[in-house]
C-alpha cells in the first residue's frame, strides 16, 4: 500500500515536524524521548524503528550514533512530497525496510524565480520562521531553504505530585536548518543533482 502526501497536503496539515506529519498517517506510530529536539522513533506495522527506512531524494538517511534516522532534521518547508510504502521491502532495500519505506522528495527549482516564507508561533514559547527560493533557467535549476525553530520547552514533572520534591526541568530547543538542491538536466532523461542539508 502506497500513500502519497503532496505539497498542498503538507501545508494543510497541523504538524510542524516530519514526525508529527507521519504520525497522522494510518499504520505509523512514533514515540519520543521528550519534547522538541529529542530523538524520535518512527515505527511501521508495529516493528522497531530500525526497520523503517528513510530515503531523501533516493539516498539513505540515517545516524551512525543513534542507529535510526534523525527524522526531524529535515524541515517540512524543504519537502515537495512524501511517499509511504507499507510492508516488507527487504528484498529491494535490505533488513531496515522490513516495516516499510518513507521516501521524501525535496523541492526543485521553479521556472523564473519563486520565493516563499512562513512564520508561526505556539504554546511554550514555540516559534518558527522559514524562507526559501526556487529558480530555474534552461537546463539549470536550484532550490534553497532556510528555517529557524525555537522552543522554550515545558516541564515534564508535576508540581502537584504527592511524593517527592518538585524540580522543574524545562528543556528548550533551538534548531537552524539549511538545505540546497542544484540540478542540471542533460540529454533525454539524464540528470545530475547535488544535494546538501545541514541541521
State what each model feature region is.
Residues 1-13, 41, 49:
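N-terminal periplasmic "start-of-domain" segments of outer-membrane beta-barrel proteins
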Residues 59-86:
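Short acidic/polar hinge/loop motifs at secondary-structure boundaries
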Residues 96-98, 125-129, 174-178:
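Residues that define the transmembrane beta-barrel architecture of outer-membrane proteins
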Residues 19-63, 80:
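Extracytoplasmic beta-strand/coil segments of soluble accessory domains associated
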Residues 90, 103, 111-112, 120, ...:
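Periplasmic-side early beta-strands and strand-to-turn transitions of outer-membrane beta-barrels
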Residues 49-52, 108-115:
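Short, charged/polar, Gly/Pro-enriched secondary-structure boundary elements
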Residues 2, 7, 15-22, 71, ...:
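Extracytoplasmic/secreted envelope proteins and their assembly/folding machinery
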Residues 22, 82-84, 102-104:
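Non-catalytic regulatory/gating segments with a bias toward low-complexity or hydrophobic composition
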Amino acid at each position: 500500500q502506497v500513500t502519497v502526501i503532496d505539497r498542498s497536503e503538507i501545508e494543510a496539515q497541523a504538524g510542524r515536524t516530519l514526525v508529527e506529519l507521519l504520525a497522522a498517517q494510518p499504520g505509523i506510530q512514533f514515540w519520543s524521548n521528550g519534547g522538541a529536539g529529542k530523538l524520535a522513533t518512527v515505527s511501521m506495522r508495529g516493528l522497531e524503528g530500525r526497520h523503517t527506512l528513510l530515503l531523501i531524494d533516493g539516498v539513505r538517511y540515517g545516524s551512525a550514533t543513534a542507529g535510526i534516522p534523525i527524522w526531524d532534521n529535515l524541515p517540512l518547508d524543504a519537502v515537495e512530497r512524501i511517499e509511504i510504502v507499507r510492508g516488507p521491502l527487504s528484498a529491494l532495500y535490505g533488513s531496515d525496510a522490513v516495516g516499510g519505506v518513507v521516501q521524501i522528495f525535496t523541492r526543485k527549482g521553479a521556472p523564473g524565480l519563486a520565493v516563499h516564507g512562513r512564520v508561526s508561533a505556539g504554546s511554550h514559547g514555540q516559534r518558527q520562521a522559514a524562507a526559501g527560493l526556487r529558480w530555474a533557467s534552461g537546463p539549470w535549476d536550484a532550490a534553497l531553504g532556510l528555517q529557524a525553530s525555537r522552543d522554550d520547552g515545558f516541564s515534564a514533572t508535576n508540581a502537584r505530585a504527592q511524593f517527592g520534591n518538585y524540580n522543574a526541568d524545562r528543556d528548550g530547543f533551538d534548531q537552524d536548518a539549511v538545505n540546497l538542491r542544484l540540478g542540471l538536466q542533460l540529454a533525454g532523461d539524464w540528470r545530475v543533482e547535488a544535494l546538501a542539508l545541514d541541521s
